[in-house]
Amino acid sequence: MSIEVLGISGSPIENSNTDRLIRAMLEATERESEFVKLSRITVRPCFACKRCIPDNVCKVRDDFPELAEKIKEARALIIGAYTPYKQIDGFTKALLERFWSLRHVNNLLRGKLCATVLTYLTPDAADHVNQSLATELEQMERMELVGQLMVKGNLTCLTCGVGDECEMSGIKRRYGPEARSCDVPYSRVEDQQEVWEKAMRIGRLIGQRLRTMDRN
């Protein structure tokens, strides 16, 4: 069966909050879906070679052309990212750059449904990244953005093994001079009730919209 909803995660952490929420949203759509983790494949940044202009096919030799076929086939995308250094992660940034190859003349993403998941530590930075995502997907790719989710993530220093001793650790800076990694609870997306419920609503909405399109 063809892919109707494609979930793409830019989180490199195995079974991360981002991954689990995307998978749950895919299930909530009740449509044929597939999950892709960008850290398991190779999608390099755009080389600005412009060789994609005549046929909307990227000529960079990595895994994007194969992924692009799935993206073109899908009727809806759920894109997950996170915000290291208060910016969008490199995996997702490279993917968004490569969307450029699909835009020329034919605008192959136009009209597709889309939702985003963003895992963050700093709310202000996340707001800025969310705004940038909305601008690219709606205004540049002409997709229909049906929802955006923000998930509270976890400080990397909590699980690196040296976070309590490292001079550069963010634990004390963020949680106080006496804080230790064992004092900070792990943030699970399943425990963020409002976020989880909103995600399920968005997933169901995508499924409903696709069913409505089928009837028309």
Regions picked out by a protein language model, each given a short descriptive name:
Residues 59-144:
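Helix-loop-strand module that forms the ligand-binding subsite of alpha/beta enzymes
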Residues 9-11, 18-21, 76-91, 185-205:
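Short Fe-S-cluster ligation motifs
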Residues 29-34, 142-144:
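A generic structural motif
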Residues 53-69, 165-174:
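Iron-sulfur (Fe-S) cluster-binding segments and ferredoxin-like electron-carrier domains
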Residues 9, 37, 149-150:
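Residue-level recognition of beta-strand->loop/alpha-helix junctions
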